[in-house]
Amino acid sequence: MSDTIAVEIKQLPHAEGLPLPAYQSAHAAGLDLCAANSADAPLLLAPGSYVLVPTGLTIALPENYEAQVRPRSGLAAKHGVTVLNAPGTIDADYRGEIGVLLINHGDAPFTIRRGERIAQMVIAPVVRAELIGVETLSETARGVGGFGSTGR
């Protein structure tokens, strides 16, 4: 299996001057995504509120791949700001702008400025399932034990 795949990316006009997503270390799994809101109009994220942040990017993923939009741990740990629908899924056939749905779980307002790294994008292979209807499922030691059944 190859260590890299080619992913076509296009910057929209409102992302002009911003860096393309990039890995921040040699073994990073995610490419950092930047906010592409206007420099004249920072987004204010009040506690308990959410906002769709533009990235100004569109991508063309190869067939059988997806991109997952995930939180940046520093924003969550320091400010309580995270990706609301984590992980957000970008399908291989989607060609629209990548948006990041951020929510503020913190106690203070959070300002999102143009160019700020707001999320990370992980490219991952997809295995498609063929669902087979059955009358019964095979038995397991766990059985129907659900939430909390394997311990605290």
Swiss-Prot record:
InterPro entries: dUTPase, dUTPase-like, dUTPase-like_sf, dUTPase_trimeric. GO terms for biological process: dUMP biosynthetic process; dUTP catabolic process. GO terms for molecular function: dUTP diphosphatase activity; magnesium ion binding. It comes from the Bacteria. It catalyses: dUTP + H2O = dUMP + diphosphate + H(+). PANTHER family: DEOXYURIDINE 5'-TRIPHOSPHATE NUCLEOTIDOHYDROLASE. It is an enzyme of class 3 (hydrolase). Its EC number is 3.6.1.23. NCBIfam families: dut, PRK00601.1. Pathway: Pyrimidine metabolism; dUMP biosynthesis; dUMP from dCTP (dUTP route): step 2/2. The keyword Magnesium applies. SUPFAM superfamilies: dUTPase-like (SSF51283). This enzyme is involved in nucleotide metabolism: it produces dUMP, the immediate precursor of thymidine nucleotides and it decreases the intracellular concentration of dUTP so that uracil cannot be incorporated into DNA. Transmembrane segments: none annotated. This is Deoxyuridine 5'-triphosphate nucleotidohydrolase. Keywords: Hydrolase, Magnesium, Metal-binding, Nucleotide metabolism. The keyword Metal-binding applies. Its cofactor is Mg(2+). Substrate binds at R72, S73, G74, N85, T89, I90, D91. Belongs to the dUTPase family.
